[in-house]
Amino acid sequence: MTPEIESVPRPEWSPLPYEGCRNVQGKVLVDEKELLLAVLRFEPDGTIHEHPGATDTVVVCLDGSGFTSVASETAPLHAGQRVRWPAGITHRLWTEDSTMTTLMVERPRHVP
């Protein structure tokens, strides 16, 4: 079987365009119907505002550390850890004095 190799755009870092987000840049790596992969880079005092997501999201901390909240419960997030944000539940991600790089994996909720 021959591997299916396709070219993909080489994304540039760009600031997140959402109101309430600051000091965070992102790169979308894959944007398909069933899967979104993005890398986010947080500077000190970076934040993704509190909001409910439309899809289940897994956040993997690749480097550095920060904080996350899910349904108003707060926890630290360090390199080598992940957190799941269920669809429709309010969540937030931020840094204080440190930097952090995360992989964001979003996929639609499967309804039986």
Residue map of PLM features:
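Short beta-strand His + acidic residue motifs that chelate non-heme Fe in jelly-roll/DSBH
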Residues: I48-E50, T68-S69, W85, H91-D97
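Short, acidic/polar N-cap/turn motifs at the starts of alpha helices
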Residues: Q25-K27, L37, D56, S65, ...
